[in-house]
A protein has these predicted regions:
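Conserved class I S-adenosyl-L-methionine
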Residues: 1-49
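Class I SAM-dependent methyltransferase SAM/SAH-binding core
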Residues: 56, 62-112
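Alpha/beta-hydrolase-fold catalytic nucleophile elbow
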Residues: 82, 128, 160
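A short acidic, Gly/Pro-enriched loop at the edge of an enzyme's catalytic core
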Residues: 115-125
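A short SAM/SAH-binding and catalytic strip from SAM-dependent methyltransferases
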Residues: 124-138
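A short glycine-rich, Lys/Arg-flanked "PGG" loop and its adjoining helix->strand segment in the class I
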Residues: 141-153
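C-terminal alpha-helical "lid/dimerization" subdomain adjacent to the S-adenosyl-L-methionine
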Residues: 156-205
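C-terminal lobe and adjacent flexible extensions of AdoMet/dcAdoMet transferase-like proteins
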Residues: 205-211
C-alpha cells in the first residue's frame, strides 16, 4: 500500500508567504471560475437564516467566500474567519475592511483546541475548498464532530470541497468521494445530509444540527 494512503500529504504551497498567498487568491477563480456559483449559493443559503446570526468560516483563505456572504447578508451579527495562514488572514482583512462584523482567528482547524479559540456557538458554519487541507481525509470525521459541537441548535453546516481528481494515492488521500463525505457527516450526527450543488468536481454538502 502506498504510504500516502496512510500518512498526511505534505503541503504543496508555502502559506506563510504573503506573495504565494496573494498569487493563489488572484489565480483561484481564473483556474476554477465556477467557484463563484458555489459562493453565491452559500451566500443565498445563509441569507435564508435571517438576521442576527453568527457565522463561522473554516479555512477562509483570502476572504472570497466571506466577501460574498457579507455582501449578501448585511444583517449578520458576526462573521468569524479561521485560517492557519497569517498572510491569508491579512488578505482577508484588506478585502473585508468595510465589514465591521468580520473577525479573524489565527488557528488551524486541525488542532485540538480550535473550538475553544473561535468563541462560542454559531448558527452556521461554512467552508469552501478547505477540508482537504487536513492533508488526509481520515481527519475529516473528527473535524465534523468538532463542527457539530460549535453549532447552535438549530444549526447549519455548508461545506464544499473537491472530489478526487484521479485514482492516484495522493488524490485519494486528500479528497473524499461524495459517499465518503456524506458518511463522515452522518457519522458526526448531522441530519438531512445531502448534496446542494455540484459542478466540475466541486461538491457542496449541507447538514443540520437539530438537537
Amino acid at each position: 500500500m502506498d504510504a500516502l494512503q496512510d500518512e498526511d500529504v505534505p503541503y504543496g504551497n508555502d502559506w506563510d508567504s504573503l506573495a504565494e498567498a496573494a498569487a493563489y487568491g488572484e489565480a483561484a477563480d481564473r483556474a476554477r471560475p465556477w467557484r463563484a456559483e458555489i459562493r453565491d449559493h452559500i451566500a443565498a443559503r445563509v441569507a435564508t437564516l435571517g438576521s442576527g446570526k453568527r457565522v463561522l468560516e473554516l479555512g477562509s483563505g483570502p476572504g472570497l467566500l466571506a466577501h460574498r456572504v457579507l455582501q449578501r447578508c448585511s444583517n449578520l451579527k458576526t462573521y468569524t474567519l479561521v485560517d492557519f495562514s497569517e498572510p491569508m488572514l491579512a488578505l482577508s482583512r484588506q478585502r473585508l475592511a468595510v465589514f465591521p462584523t468580520a473577525s479573524y482567528v489565527l488557528t488551524s482547524f486541525k488542532s485540538d483546541d480550535w473550538t475553544d479559540r473561535v468563541g462560542g456557538l454559531f448558527d452556521c458554519v461554512v467552508s469552501m475548498q478547505a477540508v482537504h487541507e487536513l492533508r488526509h481525509k481520515r481527519h475529516a470525521a473528527q473535524l465534523y464532530e468538532q463542527v457539530y459541537r460549535v453549532l447552535a441548535v438549530p444549526g447549519l453546516l455548508l461545506v464544499c470541497d473537491h472530489t478526487p481528481f484521479d485514482d492516484s494515492p495522493r488524490s485519494s488521500a486528500l479528497y473524499m468521494t461524495e459517499q465518503e463525505q456524506q458518511q463522515a457527516l452522518t457519522g458526526a450526527d448531522f441530519t438531512d445530509v445531502h448534496v446542494e450543488l455540484a459542478t466540475n468536481g466541486l461538491v457542496l454538502y449541507s447538514g443540520k444540527r437539530a438537537a
